[in-house]
């Protein structure tokens, strides 16, 4: 009983696909319903918003026309910018230590980008700018900017669109 020949195969490590045949109803592990928090016309993007379309985590699923709302947000940014500009001379006279911070704040202010965080300020300066409506305008603007993000719907995880109840160009 001596073994004369032993046959071997060289194994190459890597991913192998295993198939397990089965019958029955297949249910998705994660199935969610995505709805829009804003109204508007659905824009055409690639890939098309159709049933069976695969999406990766963070990929745009749908874009809703936002040009009118975006223009409103930019107008509110300009309004905040004007409010701050109007109080700069008073800040320079009454609170010279705070003037530098607010001046730098205005230099990094860009109407096309989200509003930067307000500079650090003492209680007296906070009361002064609050009395001029700057703080309330700032937080209103932050709310508008948050709503602006709802015009872009992104995939919360990688998966497949099972059902689409709207099509491009519709409300």
Task: Please provide the spans of the model-predicted regions.
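Active-site-adjacent helical/loop segments in soluble small-molecule enzymes
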Residues: 24
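Conserved phosphate/oxyanion-binding catalytic-loop motifs
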Residues: 36
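Periplasmic scaffold and linker elements that assemble and bridge Gram-negative envelope complexes
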Residues: 4-14, 27, 39, 43-44, ...
């Amino acid at each position: 009983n001596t073994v004369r020949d032993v046959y071997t195969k060289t194994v190459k490590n890597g991913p192998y696909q295993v198939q397990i045949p089965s019958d029955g109803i297949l249910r998705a592990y994660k199935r969610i319903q995505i709805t829009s928090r804003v109204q508007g016309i659905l824009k055409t993007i690639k890939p098309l918003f159709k049933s069976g379309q695969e999406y990766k985590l963070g990929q745009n699923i749908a874009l809703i026309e936002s040009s009118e709302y975006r223009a409103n947000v930019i107008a509110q940014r300009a309004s905040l910018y004007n409010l701050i500009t109007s109080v700069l001379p008073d800040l320079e006279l009454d609170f010279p230590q705070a003037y530098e911070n607010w001046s730098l704040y205005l230099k990094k202010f860009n109407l096309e980008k989200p509003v930067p965080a307000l500079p650090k300020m003492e209680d007296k300066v906070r009361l002064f700018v609050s009395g001029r409506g700057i703080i309330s305008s700032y937080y209103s603007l932050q709310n508008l900017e948050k709503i602006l993000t709802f015009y872009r719907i992104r995939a919360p995880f990688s998966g497949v669109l099972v059902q689409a109840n709207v099509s491009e160009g519709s409300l």
